[in-house]
Amino acid sequence: PIFHNFVLADEINRAPPKVQSALLESMQEKQVSIHGETFQLEKPFLVLATQNPIENEGTYKLPEAQIDRFALKILIDYPTKDQEIEIIEKNTSNLQIKVNPIVELKQILEMQKFNEKIYADTIILKYVASLIDATRNPKKYELDLENIIEYGASPRASIWLIKAAKANAMINGRGYVIPEDVKQVIHEVLRHRLILTFEAEAEEVNSDKVIDIILEKIPSP
């Protein structure tokens, strides 16, 4: 099932560590090794993984280094009332659900290439570098987070924050990144990359709150 352009790993934390490792390695290397033979994965190769935040029985914790390979972590809340009604209708009737393609593989590759051409000024790069550095060295920025953050964001976070900001600029019809693009995607990029302390958990401080504090402190260009 890994040899597809789009792979859905449903409840990835229920997969044994060996399976998790194999999937995440394929995400990083864009290839799979079977019995000593290496197979290249076709482009684009996109992985969407889900986790159940409530049920922990029978699950396996993903190592932080492997979680870091995911570009974004998006939180999905309960559906709205209208969405709930639509879900009920589609699942309690003889209605045939048909899914129509909305984009071709070629278009995805073209968008990925176009995204690389979006301009990010040095000022934006420095802003992103400061935001990430603040997660590692909060004291340098007069942030009282040393007892809250155990491990800050990795260099991969900086890369994906710029990539996501470029994508946000593209979606909004701009060929250049502005600080607002960074702010609009930073929670999705960083929330799974910040490792917090037990003290943070005791004080009910989550990654999103830490990101908010850093955004308020670091001056926006």
Feature names for model-found ranges:
Residues 1-4, 37-39:
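P-loop NTPase nucleotide-binding/switch module
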Residues 11-19, 27-105, 109-118, 166-168:
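Canonical AAA+ ATPase core
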Residues 73-145, 171-175, 179, 200-202, ...:
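Conserved C-terminal "switch" segment of AAA+ ATPases
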